[in-house]
Amino acid sequence: MARVKRGVTKHQRHKKVLKLAKGFRGAKSKLYRPANEQVMKSLAYAYAHRRDKKGDFRKLWIARINAAARLNGLSYSRMMNGLKIAGVSVNRKMLADLAINDAAAFTELVNVAKAQVSAK
């Protein structure tokens, strides 16, 4: 059986890892082993944080909706309950966008929610 020395294969793998490690500080962008360790950790962080991002944006939208709703005299939870009772199916992303860019439309939605909550 022939001896396999891995010269080209190893070089290509090292080059691929060092390319991914571009921009890292110190040895983590120059030497294969620390670069490989950091690249693996970075990819793990990227994977986890792509999932965290969904919750982070939801929290941001809720904070924005709550702030705008309180300016109109209603808490976030009461507003969402009122909109649900009224059958208004506007998601949090759209509500947060309305709160920032179209205050008049948001105020109308708050009034709809207020009417439903007070009628209950």
Curated annotation (Swiss-Prot):
Against SUPFAM superfamilies, the record matches this protein to:
Ribosomal protein L20
**Gene Ontology biological process terms, A to Z:** ribosomal large subunit assembly; translation
Q: Report the InterPro entries cross-referenced here.
A: Ribosomal_bL20 (IPR005813), RIBOSOMAL_L20_CS (IPR049946), Ribosomal_protein_bL20_C (IPR035566)
Query: What UniProt keywords are attached to this protein's entry?
Result: Ribonucleoprotein, Ribosomal protein, RNA-binding, rRNA-binding
Q: Which GO terms describe its molecular function?
A: rRNA binding; structural constituent of ribosome
Q: Quick one: a GO cellular component term? A: ribosome
* The family this protein is said to belong to: Belongs to the bacterial ribosomal protein bL20 family.
Entry protein name: Large ribosomal subunit protein bL20
One Pfam family assigned to this protein is: Ribosomal_L20
List the Gene3D superfamilies.
Answer: 6.10.160.10, Ribosomal protein L20 (1.10.1900.20)
Keyword RNA-binding on entry: yes
Determine the domain of life of the protein's source: Bacteria
Q: Which HAMAP family match?
A: Ribosomal_bL20 (MF_00382)
Which parts form a coiled-coil structure per UniProt? none
Q: Does the keyword Nucleus apply?
A: no
General function of this protein: Binds directly to 23S ribosomal RNA and is necessary for the in vitro assembly process of the 50S ribosomal subunit. It is not involved in the protein synthesizing functions of that subunit.
